[in-house]
């Protein structure tokens, strides 16, 4: 009954439906033209597609905490809670739909610590790698 008339009682069913729609959109976009897809298990969804570059961008906990406090103007306690909550949710989502951790290097072509070069430097590095790989 809940599957036919979801009224908020079957949250996972709704999340599964959303994932299926996102999957169709991601595959459609990737097959039509060049694009950048952030998250949404795109490494898993596009694993059999040609001309894909799977990049995992991360930063050490301390850098993430400082970013939340300084750039997002969060208290340190709120930042800690938010980081923990977001990490847990991302990991659970990716493990549910892809079957592995989002940080699993076996499913990435490249992993970059963004604290080394900053946001702009990391973007420049990725742009150069894309130019060399696809042009």
State what each model feature region is:
Residues 23, 119-127:
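Short, amphipathic alpha-helical "lid/cap" segments that border enzyme active or binding sites
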Residues 1-34:
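ATP-dependent small-molecule kinase phosphotransfer cores
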Residues 128-135:
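Short, charged, intrinsically disordered terminal tails
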Residues 42-43, 59-64, 116-118:
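Conserved nucleotide-binding/hydrolysis micro-motifs of P-loop NTPases
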Residues 48-70, 76-86:
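Conserved phosphate-donor/acceptor-positioning beta-strand/loop module used by diverse small-molecule
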Residues 1, 75-120:
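Small-molecule kinase domains that catalyze NTP-dependent phosphoryl transfer to phosphate-bearing small molecules
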Residues 29, 42-48:
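RNA pseudouridine synthases
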């Amino acid at each position: 009954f809940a599957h036919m008339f979801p009224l908020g009682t079957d949250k996972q069913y709704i999340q599964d439906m959303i994932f299926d729609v996102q999957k169709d959109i991601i595959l459609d976009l990737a097959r039509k033209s060049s694009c950048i897809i952030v998250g949404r298990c795109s490494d898993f969804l596009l694993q059999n597609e040609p001309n894909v570059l799977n990049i995992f961008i991360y930063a050490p906990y301390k850098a993430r905490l400082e970013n939340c406090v300084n750039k997002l103007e969060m208290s340190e306690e709120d930042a800690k809670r938010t980081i923990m909550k977001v990490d847990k949710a991302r990991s659970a989502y990716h493990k549910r739909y892809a079957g592995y951790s989002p940080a699993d290097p076996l499913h990435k072509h490249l992993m970059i610590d963004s604290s080394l070069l900053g946001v702009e430097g990391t973007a420049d590095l990725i742009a150069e790698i894309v130019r060399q790989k696809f042009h």
